[in-house]
Regions:
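Glycine-rich beta-strand-to-loop/alpha-helix junction loops that act as flexible
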Residues: 1-9, 40-42
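Extended, folded domain segments that form the structural surfaces/walls around functional sites
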Residues: 7-36
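Charged (often Lys/Glu-rich) extended helix/loop segments that serve as interaction or gating elements
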Residues: 24, 33-175
Length: 175
């Protein structure tokens, strides 16, 4: 079984009820005497990853602002691939709210190089850091070198210890 044990990608979604789910599975196993194999995927590692991106440019289009990040669809394919939602936060909090909606996009010239559009978000400026949450499942495993973009560094953080578990690629690594 897989696909049913997701994670909550927004504050609006309810947390998965493992007790209710396991109770139904146990009942089914006892009745039908079958073996069930689980693929829990996202429920185990989905919330263990965060993509941190820097704002490289802000483009005001009149009705909204495009927040262009140094991360792109090659770093996190889920929004481009199937419109997946990932909670997005400013790393440094501010109480000033933008008067215009923000569309968070990557620097690749593709219409699908888009992470999220938010109607209400704090004021941002170039070089601010943005955290795109819950990318532990299918974040790095779906990443690619599309458009000759090097893959980003991957860090493991445990308490106050930080360890590089994958070095940032360089363009020479791609050739």
């Amino acid at each position: 079984l897989g696909g049913g044990m997701g994670i909550s990608y927004s504050d609006k979604n309810k947390k998965f009820n493992y007790k209710k789910y396991s109770s139904a599975i146990v009942k089914f196993i006892r009745k039908h005497k079958v073996k069930i194999i689980f693929e829990p995927g996202r429920s185990i590692i989905g919330d263990t990853g965060t993509l941190v991106a820097k704002i490289i440019y802000i483009k005001d289009s009149g009705s909204k602002k495009f927040i262009i990040l140094d991360a792109a669809m090659n770093d996190l394919m889920r929004p481009a691939l199937y419109g997946a939602f990932h909670k997005t936060l400013a790393v440094i909090k501010s109480n000033k709210i933008s008067k215009k909606p923000y569309e968070f996009v990557g620097p690749i010239c593709e219409s699908t190089d888009k992470f999220i559009t938010l109607k209400k978000f704090q004021e941002l400026k170039e070089k601010d850091l943005i955290a795109i949450c819950d990318v532990g499942a299918y974040g790095m495993s779906l990443s690619s070198n599309y458009n000759l973009r090097p893959k980003s560094v991957e860090l493991l953080i445990k308490g106050s210890k930080i360890k590089v578990i994958r070095k940032r690629q360089k363009h020479k690594d791609l050739i």
